[in-house]
Every structure is written in structure tokens, then in C-alpha cells.
Amino acid sequence: MFLDVVRKHGNGRVAYCYARALLDIVVDSADSICEEIKLVRAALTADGEVRAFFANPVTPKENKIAVLQALGKSCKLSRTLVGFVCVVVKDGKFGLLSDMFEEFFVLLMHARGQFALEITTASPVSAAEEKRILSIVKSEYGEPATVTKRVDPAILGGFIAKADSLVIDASFAGHLRELERVSRSVVCGV
């Protein structure tokens, strides 16, 4: 929930709105659109000249749209996706296209009841430790669609598992913060 709120502020809110609209349009053909999005994202963001062409405010939008339509035909992309990207260009939001696609994938996972999990540990974990952490998460929240592992020595030990509104803080640093909070409330009456 918190990550959703943070994501929706500023340009993130714009990206969210466009992604939501795309998801609403392609709900029945989401799998094929996902593959097309990966292709479009690679084609439009990998090459610096292509990015510069679409980001250049002097280049007429009609020229940009013509290039997109030609790309759509040559790559056999769906009219829906080509139309979506053309609307993004017409609205002057091409710089947010990659964010829109990222939001789309997050929203699609939510619609399917899936979630992305990030596990943070103080040092790299063994396969057995990872399996144990995942079993804790699975027992309470279900199977994560993706798992990202991060190492942060500042947590001192244990782990922190995050996914949208879910946070399991079993880190030593988290326990120390909780101990400090309880101690203050006992000593200070706060």
C-alpha cells in the first residue's frame, strides 16, 4: 500500500494512470501484449539516437507517430499497443513510457493475484536460508511471482521481506529499534 502511494505521486501518478488505462484495454490479451511491450521498450530505449528522436521537442509529433506506425507494421505489433504509444507521444509523455510499462507489469501482477518480493539480508544467503524465508512468506501471503535479493549490512542480521504493503522485518536492526521504542515507553512513559 505504501509503495503504491509513493509510486503514484508526481510523474509516477501519470505513469500509473496510463498503465491502468492500458491494462483496462488489454485485459484479455495481456500475455501477448507483455511480449510486445518488451520488444517496444527494447526498440525505443536501447538506442540513444532513437531516444533522442522521440525526446526532441522540435521533432513534429506527426513524424514520431509515423515512425511508431512503421515500427508497428514491421514488427507485427498489435494496433492496441501502437495506438497506446502514439497517444503517449501525442500527449508529450514519451519520457515516461518506460515507467508506464513498469507500472503496467506491476498492475498486471496485482490483477493476477501475484506480487514481487524483495528480500534484504545482511550478507548473501544460502539456498537453504532463502528457502526458509520463502516458506515463511508463502505460508502467510502466497507464492511471489518474482524474488529479488539485496544485501544491506546495515540490517546487522536476519532479513527484511517487502512486497507492496507487506513488510516482514526480522532483522536485528528492526529488533533493536523495537527494543528502543519499548524501553523509551517504559522509562519515559511515552
From Swiss-Prot:
Transmembrane segments: none annotated. It is found in: Cell inner membrane. InterPro entries: ATP_synth_OSCP/delta_N_sf, ATPase_OSCP/dsu. GO terms for molecular function: proton-transporting ATP synthase activity, rotational mechanism. Pfam families: OSCP (PF00213). Its main location: membrane. It is a peripheral membrane protein. F(1)F(0) ATP synthase produces ATP from ADP in the presence of a proton or sodium gradient. F-type ATPases consist of two structural domains, F(1) containing the extramembraneous catalytic core and F(0) containing the membrane proton channel, linked together by a central stalk and a peripheral stalk. During catalysis, ATP synthesis in the catalytic domain of F(1) is coupled via a rotary mechanism of the central stalk subunits to proton translocation. Belongs to the ATPase delta chain family. This is ATP synthase subunit delta. The gene is atpH.
